[in-house]
């Protein structure tokens, strides 16, 4: 439903573009909290039950943006984002009495391009928006501490990483402080291939979702 509304709004705004065109560049910086999705899987076997899971902790995130307001309602932006999250991975096999628990660090670096659709004109003090974008995200994780180990479980690699395409959707609002300066709040979700789940044994099946609560400032030029 939200996608339909976004597409309908975009179609209307694009039809009005010639009358509204007035390109204005902007840039900004935002920071906040990143929350990763978790995953778990259980797999029955002839010898018992194999279980694996990972639990992420909330971590810091930074986002730097630059773009242009194409008209009163439509903007495009490029962004570079970083976030760090600690992880706890574990796996157990009742048949072989093997298990492990380990702590890991993880980080993501993203380059994304977004289309923003505003619902109020540029001279309004409150300007809510929806956005959708795509790009690439580099994920990396390193083992920090082996908490428990018994038997011969299949362990994740000491370090693993990959660069994958990603999709991001977000909602937010710009609150004008001055004519050129605005406070921006944004809540977004970025999804990509899940390298963490792929390292579990048995492997998890969920995609990796990165939820970000961001607040910062945007300056018009």
Q: Which role fits each region the language model picked out?
A:
Residues 34-62, 162:
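Surface-exposed strand-loop-strand hairpins of Gram-negative outer-membrane beta-barrel proteins
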Residues 1-23:
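Cleavable N-terminal export/targeting peptides
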Residues 41-47, 87-98, 146-154, 191-197:
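Flexible, solvent-exposed coil segments and beta strand-coil junctions
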Residues 22-26, 31-37, 65-149, 208-221:
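Gram-negative (and chloroplast) outer-membrane scaffold detector with strong preference
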Residues 71, 176-178:
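Residue-level recognition of beta-strand termini and adjacent short loop/turns
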Residues 85-89, 178-221:
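Predominantly the C-terminal beta-signal and adjacent terminal strand-loop region
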Residues 47-53, 96-104, 152-159, 199-205:
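Extracellular loop and loop/strand-boundary signature of outer-membrane beta-barrel proteins
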Residues 54-60, 105-110, 159-166, 205-209:
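Short sequence motifs at beta-strands and strand-loop junctions characteristic
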């Amino acid at each position: 439903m939200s996608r339909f509304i976004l597409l309908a709004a975009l179609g209307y705004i694009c039809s009005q573009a010639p009358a509204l065109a007035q390109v204005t560049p902007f840039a900004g910086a935002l920071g906040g909290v990143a929350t990763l999705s978790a995953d778990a899987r259980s797999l029955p076997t002839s010898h018992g039950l194999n279980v694996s899971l990972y639990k992420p902790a909330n971590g810091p995130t930074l986002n730097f943006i630059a773009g242009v307001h194409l008209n009163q309602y439509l903007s495009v932006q490029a962004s570079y984002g970083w976030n760090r999250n600690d992880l706890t991975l574990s796996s157990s096999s009742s048949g072989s009495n093997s298990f492990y628990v380990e702590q890991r660090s993880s980080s993501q670096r993203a380059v994304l391009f977004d289309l923003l659709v505003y619902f109020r004109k540029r001279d309004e003090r409150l300007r809510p928006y929806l956005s959708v974008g795509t790009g690439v995200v580099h994920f990396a994780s390193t083992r920090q501490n082996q908490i428990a180990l018994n038997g011969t479980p299949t362990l994740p690699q000491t370090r693993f990483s990959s660069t994958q395409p990603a999709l991001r959707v977000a909602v937010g609002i710009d609150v004008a402080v001055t004519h050129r300066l605005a406070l921006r709040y944004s809540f977004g979700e970025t999804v990509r291939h899940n390298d963490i789940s792929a390292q579990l044994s048995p492997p998890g099946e969920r995609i990796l979702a990165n939820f970000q609560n961001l607040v910062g400032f945007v300056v018009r030029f």
